[in-house]
Amino acid sequence: MKIHEYQGKELLRQFNVPVPNGIPAFSVDEAVKAAEKLGGPVWVVKAQIHAGGRGKGGGVKLAKSMDEVKRYASEILGMQLKTHQTGPEGQKVNRLLIEDGADIKKEYYFSIVTDRGTQKNVIMASSEGGMDIEEVAESHPEKIIKVFVDPMVGLTDADCDIIAKGIGVPEASIPMARDVFKNLYKTYWDTDASLVEINPLILEGNGKIKALDAKFNFDPNALFRHPEIVAYRDIDEEDAAEIEASKFDLTYISLDGNIGCLVNGAGLAMATMDAIKLFGGEPANFLDVGGGATAEKVTEAFKIMLKNKNVQAILVNIFGGIMRCDVIADGVVTACKVVNLTVPLVVRMKGTNEELGKKILADSGLPIISTDSMTEAATKVVAAVAKNK
């Protein structure tokens, strides 16, 4: 689960991480009143959406007068803000953050993420703040430092000093940086976050360290422990198809391609998408029906996939362990009839009741392409899309 920047900064304040004074606004009038309350003389008008790159997209403006606050608020509220993370359609801006300007001497990058490979938390930091970390990793990988934190030990003073010196924090500011790093780690740990990203973390002219931005992701499996964080949820920022899928215990993530994927198991779903890309196709979604799929769940999965008008073919890839292939086959046949499927459908099933499942598909009279291997399935679904172009 993601939250807005202003909500992230509310959390940071609770954990004694310094952030600029700021007030959220939901209208132009509220933006002006917020600026008046803050006092100025410089304000930052910031679009609030669940995506990065807002500044490059025109969603962050520096205002030096009340007239500019009003003008920028009018321009940004309601706009379809397009960034590298929103996709070409962009996201509508319904909220603003009006914030005091900052005396920026130096910008740093700081983030904490969960590293499942090492079973540790990893802090990534860089002297190149304010930039996309992907760009820094590509052009100046030597400027990114990583510190792995054992969750049984926590972040130590020695860790903090390695980070601060590694990104070039002045000696006089290292004690404060140490406190900020520790409080950021405590925020991450105590809220069950899977990501905390501060870009930029700044050094002010007075030598103080401050978080100028705040991006959070939270482990959805831990949200039952944090009703105060669940209250931050903004459904308007979430994909409608993903919300609909969650009602049926389906795990769905929209992608940019044109081949719908219905798979059981996250690992098999990832492998299926890799196979599609290997043979020149582009997956339109990640969709895991889990181990307890019914005809109803499969039908709803088809409905959700086909709401994406870019879908030109569907690949169903099932491994029947706990899941029975005949149950999936019944669901596929039912779904095809309910949604009146008009795009090519490729089905590959292996495992429990595999032959019975294939017979159900063959006897349905529907133009379903049945395959035995993942390679064959991916090849045929990509070919079906190419043929229909």
From Swiss-Prot:
Binds 1 Mg(2+) ion per subunit. ATP binds at residues 46, 53-55, 99, 102, 107. GO terms for biological process: succinyl-CoA metabolic process; tricarboxylic acid cycle. One of its GO terms (molecular function) is magnesium ion binding. GO terms for cellular component: cytosol; succinate-CoA ligase complex. Pathway: Carbohydrate metabolism; tricarboxylic acid cycle; succinate from succinyl-CoA (ligase route): step 1/1. Substrate binds at residues 264, 321-323. It catalyses: succinate + ATP + CoA = succinyl-CoA + ADP + phosphate; GTP + succinate + CoA = succinyl-CoA + GDP + phosphate. It is an enzyme of class 6 (ligase). Keywords: ATP-binding, Ligase, Magnesium, Metal-binding, Nucleotide-binding, Tricarboxylic acid cycle. Pfam families: ATP-grasp_2, Ligase_CoA. Mg(2+) binds at residues 199, 213. Gene3D superfamilies: ATP-grasp fold, A domain, ATP-grasp fold, B domain, Succinyl-CoA synthetase domains. The keyword Membrane does not apply. Its EC number is 6.2.1.5. The keyword Transmembrane helix does not apply. InterPro entries: ATP-grasp, ATP-grasp_succ-CoA_synth-type, ATP_grasp_subdomain_1, Succ-CoA_synthase_bsu_CS, SUCC_ACL_C, Succ_CoA_ligase-like_bsu, Succinyl-CoA_synth-like. Its cofactor is Mg(2+). Transmembrane segments: none annotated. Residues 9-244 form the ATP-grasp domain. Succinyl-CoA synthetase functions in the citric acid cycle (TCA), coupling the hydrolysis of succinyl-CoA to the synthesis of either ATP or GTP and thus represents the only step of substrate-level phosphorylation in the TCA. The beta subunit provides nucleotide specificity of the enzyme and binds the substrate succinate, while the binding sites for coenzyme A and phosphate are found in the alpha subunit. Belongs to the succinate/malate CoA ligase beta subunit family. Heterotetramer of two alpha and two beta subunits. PANTHER family: SUCCINATE--COA LIGASE [GDP-FORMING] SUBUNIT BETA, MITOCHONDRIAL, SUCCINYL-COA SYNTHETASE BETA CHAIN. This is Succinate--CoA ligase [ADP-forming] subunit beta. It comes from Polynucleobacter necessarius subsp. necessarius (strain STIR1).
